[in-house]
């Protein structure tokens, strides 16, 4: 198949974030989605243990009202199913990812030298820059939004870039490792329902486990401590739920406060709205309505839509430089493995397969090494150039280069016999008589050399060593 043949791929297949997709892009998870297995086990494990306990109690002939165990079991399984459902709804949907931009935003802002404290986003060309932050108005309040260097856009208000998922997320709350997903505008209500249902389930199992112990204490007429020692399964559930409820219960209380004040976890830790008015606060009822009863905004990304693989790669590689002066896409991103499975696009638009061994190299370090080698080469050339001037202007005695360059060439021009070098190229040891014209050239070289180095000819060479040839008698007639 020709490399220039157009290939259509779905957006999720060339997505540059760290997300994992299932079911053809219908389900989107974070890079740490494997934590879902642990979370599921932590939910289902105690639920199964509680089911076993209640079932054995219902089958025990000594139980006075076994039918009461049926509704208890039903409620526990309803809470468990809801908990798993909210967990999956939180972790498997788009949290509100902001689509990446392929080119930086157009701006008319010019660099202002009078505001040195202003931060700018710029390329290597300092004349063309865009501001790091800009002001937008939200409900009559001025809010600063930042420019995202990765997504090449100004983040919407309340959005932030998640370093784990490598995406900007609307109304970013936090990245939850227990659900393996960012918590944003499109899954926050499910996240709150997940932690609140988990809290309810823990309290429910904790309470009925104690009731089982007390019922044994009453039925068998034994002490409470003896009843505890005989009911090991209930003991395990009590300890587990007691520990767990401090975590999920604390989160539920904290996020209940955030909902009532219309804050996110990110804003609560970063800003202090008690010192200034919260531009998003609509009152307690308005805030609750916004979280639970308002319509969830649709996803801004159509992950199942088709895109041209080559065009998408070119758009990601060839970031325009009209605003930044240079591309903001690094050399490592130009040869990106996540997009095309190790393919590189040349200037004509043709795509080529990159060898496996070259796919994980750090090209930025290679470029830095090349730049250092270029600088060293330039310094060596510069040193060699001055050394060449030194050899031309300060001639050591019996130097074949001197006799060939000045003596022989001069004699060839004047038709005179040099005597500075023998016909077979060996030094004869004879001094060369230099004409007035050549002596003036040599003295000019000496003056230029001493002026450039800031020292007298007799002081020595570049490295400070004494130059015994600087006052050679050969420089005299």
From Swiss-Prot:
Q: Which portions of the sequence form the region Disordered?
A: 101-120, 374-477
* Active site as annotated: 176 (s-palmitoyl cysteine intermediate)
Give the principal location in a single coarse category: membrane
GO BP of this protein: root hair elongation
Please give the function described in this protein's UniProt entry.
Palmitoyl acyltransferase.
Query: Where is the chain membrane-spanning?
Result: 32-52, 68-88, 190-210, 236-256
Q: Which gene encodes it?
A: PAT04
Looking up Pfam families in the UniProt record yields: DHHC (PF01529)
In terms of InterPro entries, this protein maps to: Palmitoyltrfase_DHHC, PFA4/ZDH16/20/ERF2-like
Basic residues bias locations: 378-388
Record remark on domains: The DHHC domain is required for palmitoyltransferase activity.
* E.C. no: 2.3.1.225
One Gene Ontology cellular component: trans-Golgi network transport vesicle
Lineage, highest ranks first = Eukaryota, Viridiplantae, Streptophyta, Embryophyta, Tracheophyta
Question: Could you tell me which residue ranges the DHHC domain spans?
Answer: 146-196
**Keyword set includes Transferase:** yes
Can you say what this protein is called?
Answer: Probable protein S-acyltransferase 4
Q: Keyword set for this entry?
A: Acyltransferase, Cell membrane, Lipoprotein, Membrane, Palmitate, Transferase, Transmembrane, Transmembrane helix
Bias category Polar residues: which stretches?
467-477
